Amino acid sequence: MKIITRISLINLIIPGLILIQMVSCKKEDPITVTDIDGNTYYATTIGNQIWMAENLKATRLNDKTSITLVPSNSTWISATKPFYCWFSNDTSNKALYGALYNNFAVQTEKLCPSGWHVPSNDEFKALEKSLGMSQVEADSLGWRGTDQGKKMKSRTGWNNNGNGTNKSGFNGLAGGYRYGMDGGFYDRGAVSFWWTSTKKSATLGLYRRLDYNQNQVYAEGSNLKGGKYVRCVKDSI
């Protein structure tokens, strides 16, 4: 009888242990968010914030207002309202790089999906500090930090062995930019720019920049007409 009891207990215990291991080893479900156009993005936790791990592709604001698609250089540089485009006016760049937006689109405060927003300068600084940047450097402009840019860059796609580690999960791709002064497209593979929602002045919007030949992160103000990429951050609860 004792032998039977012991065998019965073992038969109960072993499946229980396997179940516990399965539960403890189960990966967390990925975080996703869907925009007004139905594009779904992966997101990641960086520090205490949840960031999109991809560039925004939306062609409408979250109230369903259309954003104007502008291929023309002359129209782009005369902007006084929200514009967007694809790099080199090639829609095949949408899937990988997302859309380039001027700062007028950012300032609508409706560019990101509901419950998300374009990160402020302070929120970008919080990201950078979570990767080891000092407060003094985070508060500065120009090239700042040590290897935070490398941690933000993707592992592929950067020129001349300039790939990052993507240790942050930000996965910054080298998507280039659209210049606000002539409307031209430049430097895909070498640089990428992201708007913040914060203005440096009435005519300049603050942004972040990553370069193939830099491990730091660049912060400065730029013409509001410039075409830069956008990430979204989840609203705090």
Give residue ranges: language-model regions.
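Polybasic, lysine/arginine-rich low-complexity segments
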Residues: 2, 26-27
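C-terminal motif of bacterial Sec signal peptides marking the signal peptidase cleavage site
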Residues: 21-24
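Conserved positions within compact, well-structured domain cores
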Residues: 27-237
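Bacterial N-terminal signal peptides that target proteins for export
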Residues: 2-13
